[in-house]
Amino acid sequence: MTDKRKDSSGKLLYCSFCGKSQHEVRKLIAGPSVYICDECVDLCNDIIREEIKEVAPHRERSALPTPHEIRSHLDDYVIGQEKAKKVLAVAVYNHYKRLRNGDTSNGVELGKSNILLIGPTGSGKTLLAETLARLLDVPFTMADATTLTEAGYVGEDVENIIQKLLQKCDYDVQKAQRGIVYIDEIDKISRKSDNPSITRDVSGEGVQQALLKLIEGTVAAVPPQGGRKHPQQEFLQVDTSKILFICGGAFAGLDKVIANRVETGSGIGFGATVKGKSQKATEGELLSQVEPEDLIKFGLIPEFIGRLPVVATLNELSEDALIQILKEPKNALTKQYQALFNLEGVELEFRDEALEAIAKKAMSRKTGARGLRSIVEAALLETMYDLPSMEEVEKVVIDESVIAGQSEPLLIYGKPEAQQASGE
């Protein structure tokens, strides 16, 4: 095609698509008996780009990663917790395989398998859920069970969880229905006693009842974007049977419930045996033997436990595991701070004894991996405050005494440019 302003007879030319004349546009491109202006070309490019954006996610979804691939990806970001990663990999693979096959296989209806993660604070429950969502490229949202109440009471309704998920994908219902919801602190909504409550328990058993249908699968009516400001708009209908719910909690004291059962010889299915005082199991070993009856005694109602058939237990992280977390994952904490210092043109070095001191401090605080950042941040605060105003600093070294608060980080200076040029 050629760029023409007038035809051979000198007539004024017009775009065949928008009808604008040659004087109203910058360029007019001619073809056999047809003309198109630069504005229409730009519009066509925009339409094509939008189409590509819509098609791309479908192409990405065509290849569902295998359990081995899911586990391998989790290994890149989460240290330890091997059993939990394997359980999650299989459960997530089966969930999305069920969605791809329309909930049925050869006429057999495939049930939904939501997941319950049990483990101490800072053991990696939230990180596992976030990493899974990132790998699968699906919308992800988190909810805190302690803020939820029954409908009609002050607090968050359970339907708000679905609204948050919709917000993460710009209110695209189809995308939201493939998402993952992580509900944290699920152990905090246990009822206060083994017996059904006589009075209203709006933040405990009542919330469990409210979550039942949502987790099992229902069509939730969610206000559209803008909510109450546009009451004339119809509610969005979201099918929660396609959403994967992962519930997590520390379940402090659950190990004692399990110990009481195991030590009386009532363990079922795990070959539990009576142990003497010298053979007391660790908390992690006890949690790995959890049974539905233990969760009922803890305060979860049987119907709620039934909606969470896949249970994965996480162990408390050891000192060695915390050191690995500091330096090995792709987004390890030390790598993050080194990248931050690199932006100032400065190298940051953590000596091995410093990493050990950070891990020891986190162990003493009993905050797990979650407490590592605050320890490193406190050690580097003064340096990060002063560094942008300092010149010629080439390297910052962190050793054990810095973590203990006994000394400042070691600053290594380079030669000034003038000295380097003169060879001094």
Curated annotation (Swiss-Prot):
Pfam families: AAA_2, ClpB_D2-small, zf-C4_ClpX. One of its GO terms (cellular component) is HslUV protease complex. ATP binds at P120, T121, G122, S123, G124, K125, T126, L127. Zn(2+) binds at C15, C18, C37, C40. One of its GO terms (molecular function) is ATP-dependent protein folding chaperone. Residues 2-56 form the ClpX-type ZB domain. GO terms for biological process: cell division; proteolysis involved in protein catabolic process. PROSITE patterns: CLPX_ZB (PS51902). Keywords: ATP-binding, Chaperone, Metal-binding, Nucleotide-binding, Zinc. Component of the ClpX-ClpP complex. Forms a hexameric ring that, in the presence of ATP, binds to fourteen ClpP subunits assembled into a disk-like structure with a central cavity, resembling the structure of eukaryotic proteasomes. HAMAP family: ClpX. NCBIfam families: clpX (TIGR00382), PRK05342.1 (NF003745). ATP-dependent specificity component of the Clp protease. It directs the protease to specific substrates. Can perform chaperone functions in the absence of ClpP. Belongs to the ClpX chaperone family. This is ATP-dependent Clp protease ATP-binding subunit ClpX. The lineage of its organism: Bacteria, Pseudomonadati, Pseudomonadota, Gammaproteobacteria, Enterobacterales. The gene is clpX.
